[in-house]
């Protein structure tokens, strides 16, 4: 898709990023005289993704930006006129030209919130024709963002708090927009950085990266740097011929490792020297272009030790093939002994980064106790979400003209919850999460310490709950087209997501066969559902 940027340098989603049937329904509403009827839709999901027990809500900021800028251009209206019946009343197209979101109100979960099945991520109210047109773009903006954020959060739970996670999936993503979105929301979900420089430029995602095998293999060893001299890190003292110092160190390193001096690949060494001259304060080596043990490691050590003499410290190595866990263990052992042998103790703590199509199961290995891996680069498994490539969000009508609406189907789990609703989160005395409650908006809010009878979804029996704390979940972000409160930054949403995840009970954080987090209905909402299920919609 053509990338169009707004005044803040962010990508624009246009109103015609939608399904044709939204336009045909809009014409139907207009012909029926119902275009301006008050209506409310809810955007939610029915099942937690990846077989888990939670999701993270994401994409709200993108939704607000889309809604505030919503306007059909002349070219948009002309295209719709070309695909709708030729005898369509021109007044309908004039109605479309005049549309904006000045009559739209949105309540939503804050970005980065824990979300559970059936609880609205967004509540969108306004004129029926308009809020119907918003369905597909809002689903597009929320579903993938929430899926990637949830996937990233799961990977962060596996990795634990100490491992650095680098998202590096841009080249594996489903197109440039998918790659850009994944970089943003994997960061929100708990990754530390991304390789995607556009995400860094436009959304402030920290960027990181190393070097590729192409850089290493492009050198043969015969290259002579135009300027081989390097000044000490302190800027005091004479400059040093770095390639010459590296060759001297190589002799000592090979003797120490029991290698012939000819074994380490000269082209690889030349590549490392070139990189070190360009980045003396950020030198890192990719060790597996030829042989980790016989070439990559000794070449890296020779360059790192030569830099160390000048007061610089290498910042890491990366492995991209083989048994990553075992190799990292062996390399760490050599770093420890080499640091002592050559009196450069900082070598012992040089970070070891790994990549190579890492998925959840491999991440579990790399994160196990005693692992010497420090940084884990994940691409395909975070951006494509292979375990579940779609969030399954839906956007359903819940009221028209102030009257509740319900969808009754042959599949009971696809039945909707009618009416305008409020949502609350109940917490226990220790601050852990107990359940989420859905009730009609007209009901008084529940209070802490108040015993309530509620109906957990998926059960036929009520239960009694007495929360120590009650938190309203849905906040008013857009009222009559006006933003009601400043939207948090990406970093603030990321911190909020991590804080929210910390409140989940361990049983709900399990990635395999987790306990189901309960979502319950108030007695009044349950009674309305039963009534409409028996009688059909009002």
UniProtKB/Swiss-Prot annotation:
Keywords: Cytoplasm, Ligase, Magnesium, Manganese, Metal-binding, Phosphoprotein, Pyridine nucleotide biosynthesis, Transferase. GO terms for cellular component: cytosol. Nicotinate binds at residues 21, 210, 318. Activity is highest with Mn(2+). Homodimer. Signal peptide: none annotated. It is found in: Cytoplasm, Cytosol. Catalyzes the first step in the biosynthesis of NAD from nicotinic acid, the ATP-dependent synthesis of beta-nicotinate D-ribonucleotide from nicotinate and 5-phospho-D-ribose 1-phosphate. Helps prevent cellular oxidative stress via its role in NAD biosynthesis. One of its GO terms (molecular function) is metal ion binding. This is Nicotinate phosphoribosyltransferase. PANTHER family: NICOTINATE PHOSPHORIBOSYLTRANSFERASE. The keyword Transport does not apply. It comes from Mus musculus (Mouse). It catalyses: nicotinate + 5-phospho-alpha-D-ribose 1-diphosphate + ATP + H2O = nicotinate beta-D-ribonucleotide + ADP + phosphate + diphosphate. Pathway: Cofactor biosynthesis; NAD(+) biosynthesis; nicotinate D-ribonucleotide from nicotinate: step 1/1. Belongs to the NAPRTase family. The modification Phosphohistidine is found at residue 213. CDD domains: NAPRTase_A. Its cofactor is Mg(2+); Mn(2+). Its EC number is 6.3.4.21. Its main location: cytoplasm. Disulfide bonds: none annotated. Transiently phosphorylated on a His residue during the reaction cycle. Phosphorylation strongly increases the affinity for substrates and increases the rate of nicotinate D-ribonucleotide production. Dephosphorylation regenerates the low-affinity form of the enzyme, leading to product release. Abundantly expressed in the small intestine, liver and kidney. It holds the Pfam family NAPRTase_C. 5-phospho-alpha-D-ribose 1-diphosphate binds at residue 380.
């Amino acid at each position: 898709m053509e990338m169009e940027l707004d005044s803040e340098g962010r990508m624009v989603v246009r109103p015609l990023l939608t399904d044709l049937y939204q336009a045909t329904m809009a014409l139907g509403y207009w012909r029926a005289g119902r275009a301006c009827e008050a209506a409310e839709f809810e955007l939610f999901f029915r099942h937690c993704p990846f077989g888990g027990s939670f999701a993270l809500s994401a994409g709200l900021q993108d939704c607000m930006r889309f809604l505030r800028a919503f306007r059909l251009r002349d070219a948009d209206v002309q295209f719709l006129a070309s695909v709708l019946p030729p005898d369509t009343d021109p007044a309908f197209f004039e109605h479309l030209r005049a549309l904006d979101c000045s009559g739209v109100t949105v309540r939503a979960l804050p970005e980065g919130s824990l979300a559970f099945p059936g609880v609205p991520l967004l509540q969108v109210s306004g004129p029926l024709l308009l809020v119907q047109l918003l369905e597909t773009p809002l689903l597009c903006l929320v579903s993938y963002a929430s899926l990637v954020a949830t996937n990233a959060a799961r990977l962060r739970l596996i990795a634990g708090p100490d491992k650095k996670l680098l998202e590096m999936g841009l080249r594996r993503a489903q197109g440039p927009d998918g790659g850009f979105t994944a970089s943003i929301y994997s960061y929100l979900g708990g990754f530390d950085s991304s390789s995607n420089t556009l995400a860094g430029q436009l959304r402030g995602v920290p960027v990181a990266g190393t070097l590729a095998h192409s850089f290493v293999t492009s050198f043969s060893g015969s290259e002579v740097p135009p300027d081989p001299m390097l000044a000490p890190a302190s800027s005091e003292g004479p400059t040093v011929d770095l390639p010459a110092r590296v060759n001297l160190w190589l002799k000592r390193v090979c003797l120490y490792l029991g290698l012939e001096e000819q074994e380490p690949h000269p082209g690889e060494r030349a590549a490392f020297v070139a990189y070190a001259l360009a980045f003396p304060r950020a030198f890192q080596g990719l060790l597996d272009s030829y042989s980790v043990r016989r070439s990559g490691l000794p070449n890296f050590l020779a360059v790192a030790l030569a830099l160390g003499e000048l007061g610089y410290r290498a910042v890491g190595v990366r492995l991209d093939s083989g048994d990553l866990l075992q190799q990292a263990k062996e390399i760490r052992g050599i770093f420890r002994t080499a640091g002592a042998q050559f009196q450069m103790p900082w070598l012992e703590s040089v970070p070891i980064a790994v990549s190579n199509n890492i998925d959840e199961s491999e991440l579990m290995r790399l994160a196990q106790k005693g692992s010497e891996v420090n940084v884990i680069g994940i691409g395909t498994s975070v951006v494509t979400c292979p375990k579940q490539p779609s969030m399954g969000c839906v956007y359903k009508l819940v009221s028209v003209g102030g009257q509740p609406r319900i969808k009754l189907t042959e599949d009971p789990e696809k039945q909707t919850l009618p009416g305008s609703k409020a949502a609350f989160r109940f917490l226990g005395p220790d601050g852990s999460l107990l359940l989420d409650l859905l009730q009609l908006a007209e009901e008084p809010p529940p209070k802490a310490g108040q015993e309530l009878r509620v109906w957990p979804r998926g059960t036929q029996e009520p239960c009694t709950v007495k929360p120590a704390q009650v938190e309203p979940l849905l906040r008013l972000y857009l009222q009559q087209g006006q933003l009601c409160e400043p939207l948090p930054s990406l970093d603030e949403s990321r911190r909020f997501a991590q804080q929210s995840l910390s409140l989940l009970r361990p049983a709900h954080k399990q990635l395999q066969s987790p306990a189901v987090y309960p979502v319950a209905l108030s007695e009044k909402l349950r009674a309305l559902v039963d009534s409409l299920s028996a009688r059909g919609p009002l």
